[in-house]
Amino acid sequence: TEALLYTDEHEGMAAAQIFGNDPEILRAACENEKLAPFPIVDINMGCPVPKIYKNGEGSALLENPALAEKIVRECVKSGKIITVKFRIGIDAAHIVTADFAKRMENAGASLITVHGRTKDKVYAGEVQYKEIESAKKAVQIPVIANGGVFSDADADKLLNETGADGVMVARAALFDPQI
């Protein structure tokens, strides 16, 4: 895991992503000297992996917004810029996008990234542009749209349809780092 933290002065500003469900442990992680090169810490509240979800981490926090807020508040105390990545909900019957976005902003997140699918869809299915747009309309902080970006055209469509401030490319970059 330590090898994943490698960075050098030519990279400019870099962020580290963490996940968990214990506010104090996550704050300690933010304050750990190994994260010193990273002025930004992103908290992953969107991971759909069953093991992570069963531990009450990742996308499970969508079902426990009070704990998610506590995590953000605690991590902000570290002095790092705290951002949050999350999904639009657990499933179609439990969409939480706008409310969760507001709660993360109120807890002190400086930016949010919204993956436009529910946890149960993992990486398949249509990206719900309207849900990402609802997050953008609900908060004053920057909103990054995520999900289904495999080309410049996909990124343009995601920006145009959601009004987001930016786009995050994920899996596609593994196959085409120049995307």
Q: Where are the model-predicted features located?
A:
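Flavin-dependent oxidoreductase catalytic cores
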Residues: T1-I179
